[in-house]
Amino acid sequence: MTGARNWLNKPLIFFKFNNHHTASPGDKMVKYVAFFEELGKDDVGIAGGKGANLGELTQAGIPVPPGFVVTAATYDKFMTDTGLQPVVMEMLENLDVNDTKELQRVSAEIKDIITSTEVPEDIQTLIIESYNALCQRIGKDDVYVAIRSSATAEDLPEASFAGQQDTFLNIRGAEDVLDYVRRCWASLFEARAIFYREENNFDHSKVYIAVVVQEMVDAEKAGVMFTVHPSTGEDRILIEGSWGLGEAVVSGSVTPDTYWVDKGTGKLLEFTVGEKNIMFTREDGRTVKKEVPPELRNKRVLSDGEIAALAEMGRRIQDHYGSPQDTEWAIMDGDVYMLQSRPITTLGEATEETEVKSREILVKGLGASPGLASGRVKIIREIHELDKIQIGDILVTVMTTPDMVPAMKRASGIITDEGGVTCHAAIVSRELGIPCVVGTGNATEVLKENQVVSIDGNRGLVYEGSVIEGEKKEAEAETVTVESPLLTVTEVKVNVSMPEAARKAAATGADGVGLLRTEHMMLTTGVHPRKFIEEGREDELVNTLAENILKVADEFYPRPVWYRTLDAPTDEFKTLEGGENEPYEHNPMLGWRGIRRELDEPEILRAEFRAIKKLHEQGYTNIGIMIPLVQHPDELRKAKMIAEEAGLKPHRDVEFGIMVETPAAALIIEDFIEEGIDFVRLEP
């Protein structure tokens, strides 16, 4: 193997392992590491979009911080040599990516498998020697680097999505570099990336990931630059910038300064100074998010000279590639660096303006993706709220993240408080072809849940009601206007006995499940729950319960599902395997059942609570617990103690309620309230 330590004498390094390896990306001579100087725009197959374009920029004489690429062949070798490839592909088989919770679960499991698998020694040597060679070139020990994913399909002209895989900043030392390269490999299976590949019919087994390891630029100011208007294709340069590292702009954490530049003359045509409240900087080897000093928040970031230098560099890059480019830049000590460049794949034309007649303007922002759309406002403040976005809704949030892409696909338009026209929300909206308004400042506060609004992605305006007239309005109505169910003050819930009936029950439009019975789930196993416990099969019982409860919780999510703990009459469980010792009772309906029985057999109740905890950890926090046939607050108190032993804190982690089925319980309801309950079901 040619050693990376010889790199100064041989500027182009090719690594070749002697052991057998089939390189799916398919070069005659497999490159496992390539420094930027040896890469060009045609090397997307081995270096991914980022890596190939950094090589192309370097060869074109554009100032780029030095670095190297751990190629897609190395990832392929890692997955093959460790035996992970067939395991991961099997986990992805038959996955429904529109099932958000299942997608998140599978993604987390795959990433955990990859990051916990030791990197083979030959690959470790390759990466560590390459990092040491980079440090030698720069003339420093343990150089700080940025480690960025570079998927082989991420930045191709026909497919572009922001932020599918991970980026790690301020990584230092060979061991940490090795660890974060592996994390980048794992990020190929982020939920958002899996979803994107499925939606675009990319074969998971044929998508690879390269990893860029690049000297870290400790930027004083940074941002993005489009060499044409990203929405309309207008031939002028757009620059966005903010203080510190570029993460603040790219992530949409701030509303950056916006500068429009004449491409021919380099003259600044217009600019808007954004309110830049936060910044990312490097402190003690860590990327730190901090507040921008008050005197800089509303101060212009770029000088005329810096704008001219960036515009000139943008023209050079576009001329070199022969097509409009989306670039990232940074300025350190007065020097301008390009961090990456990729083709703009979302160019469109401004849509025909529709006349707006006497409509109230609710909020104003920046038009980030052209078009007009009307729909009902759905405000997203937490990631677990995404499932409330239905087809045709208007998604309103502070700023979108890559995890929101499946919900964004269902929306007819996007509105954000923060961000500029090159933030995540803007890029994804243009890719999806839906209108987007960003940087409104207060949309999440001004707009109301379920309010009907219209957004103008050309002008950056949001109007009250529907403003789409004529044919456009009719066409929009087919996808946006939904016949709302009758609204009542009292919620109407359904009973569900069999998980298989959940879909039909959910389709009724009920406000939730007021009673999810456990007994049918137990009976279908054919085994008495006590037998599971006695034979040490508690985990099997937990998983069986969780699988059945999940079918209901998923259909109704985020509507509440009240799970009633086991209320097993003795006569029904006699026929189960292990039920031979069930006592004989003259009237089982008034006998040993409900919470009385479960406190006598606490292991079964604990297994039920463990199943619910497992589902809560997967995001199904809509499941509440309901205790049946309570007679006294002491029973409720003991049930809560068992729940806490199982890892569920009543009232904090999970809603905890009771069924009132006897006059005695009804007469002392205030005692139950004092003990603490979140809801009551009255059983006549």
Curated annotation (Swiss-Prot):
GO molecular function: ATP binding; metal ion binding; pyruvate, water dikinase activity
GO terms for biological process, alphabetical: gluconeogenesis
Reactions listed under catalytic activity: pyruvate + ATP + H2O = phosphoenolpyruvate + AMP + phosphate + 2 H(+)
One Pfam family linked to the record: PPDK_N
Active site: 424
Residue positions binding Mg(2+): 661
InterPro entries per UniProt: ATP_grasp_subdomain_1, PEP-util_enz_mobile_dom, PEP_synth, PEP_util_AS, PEP_util_C, Phosphohistidine_dom_sf, PPDK_AMP/ATP-bd, Pyrv/PenolPyrv_kinase-like_dom
EC numbers: 2.7.9.2
Top-rank lineage group of the source organism: Archaea
Family: Belongs to the PEP-utilizing enzyme family.
Protein's job: Catalyzes the phosphorylation of pyruvate to phosphoenolpyruvate.
Domain comment in the entry: The N-terminal domain contains the ATP/Pi binding site, the central domain the pyrophosphate/phosphate carrier histidine, and the C-terminal domain the pyruvate binding site.
Entries under NCBIfam families matching the protein: PEP_synth, PRK06464.1
Name of the molecule in the record: Probable phosphoenolpyruvate synthase
Originating organism: Methanothermobacter thermautotrophicus (strain ATCC 29096 / DSM 1053 / JCM 10044 / NBRC 100330 / Delta H)
Encoding gene (name): ppsA
